[in-house]
Amino acid sequence: GGIFYKTISVFIPNECSPRFDIASKEGTPWTGFKNMEMTSDKPNEVNFEFIRQLKKDFPNKVIVSSIMGASDDEWAILAKESEKAGADMIECNFSCPQMTSSTMGSDVGQNPDLVKHYCEVASSSTKLPIIAKMTPNLGNMEIPARAAIEGGAKGIAAINTVKSITNLDINLRTGMPVVNGKSAISGYSGAAVKPIALRFISDLMHDPIVSKVPITGMGGIETWRDCLEFLMLGASNLQVTTAVMQYGYRIVEDMISGISHYMNDYGINKLQDIVGTAVGNIVGADDLDRSYKILVQIDKEKCVGCGRCYVSCFDAAHQAIEYDYATRVPTINEDKCVGCHLCLNVCPVMHCIQPGKLVYKDKKDNHAVTLKESNSYL
């Protein structure tokens, strides 16, 4: 393992206070985290001395210097200083969404020409390999990722934070966090962005050019299962930040332990044997098998009679659940059920509603179907 040092720039930010906000549900730990922080607020001589000391103290760990310039000269200087400090690798950050200059951060990351150019500048200024950190604030990440590779990047990192407004103060009528009555659009991270991150990792791995270079995955990683999902979609190494801010470095030990147990249970000897194993199973919507439906079954012993499945199906699906108000027991109407599994996902009782009978739309059909497994990991 190793560390990615907080992004270093020639520009030293004057940070606002407060600068964090969260999105949560019903008092649970936050699922989303908004930050209005920019690059490192320390002088560069301090930053590079930290990198130098880290490499001295942990010579067998990978130390990555993350840099962000606003001009050719700045990218070149930061790359050279990173190498002098003893970093093993350089990450070019083209993706921070809350920079105060349009010449830095995600504004650059949305411009493939600038991404390519700055990668050329950085890579020509150092012998160290560079990777380009992509912004998710666009439609097709493959375009700037290809540009980065053309510019000399040896790998891609994805994703950085998503532009957001998490909450509003409805009394002051402004966003949060509130800074003297105002707020700003800024980066969103945490578990809530994992689906977005996984989608971009999949997109990159389906690109014939980008998939040939290593991908560093990040965005919503909290557990060992999250780690596995990124690895299976093609990320060969991972970054974790927001979860460490929430739970501390100890969660990394849990991640390593969980992955190790999974590998032992499945007889997997090398972590690399996991990487990319799910890529081929992510296909276009038109390639999905639509010849059958999977009905659901309700365990009447586990059912608590809350009626949530009935309400959701009646108001937002196909009215395929009948509810006995006297006994508070729901029943599936198999003729109406389309197998959408909305009820399964709203049920608050674990394993109360589960996949049931497979029904082919053409009654003469009986081809083999791969179904979701139910085991201790799911």
PLM features: residue spans?
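N-terminal capping/small domains of soluble enzymes
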Residues: 1-63, 68-73, 255
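Alpha/beta enzyme core
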Residues: 2, 68-216, 222-237, 284, ...
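Short secondary-structure boundary segments
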Residues: 6-8, 94, 160, 242-243
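C-terminal helical cap(s) of enzyme catalytic domains, especially alpha/beta-barrels
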Residues: 13-29, 165-185, 231, 243-268, ...
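Extended, intrinsically disordered, low-complexity segments
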Residues: 194, 199, 257-306, 311, ...
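Iron-sulfur cluster-binding cysteine motifs and their immediate structural context
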Residues: 308-326, 342-360
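Short linker/helix segments within small regulatory modules
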Residues: 324-335
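Short Fe-S-cluster ligation motifs
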Residues: 334-353, 371-378
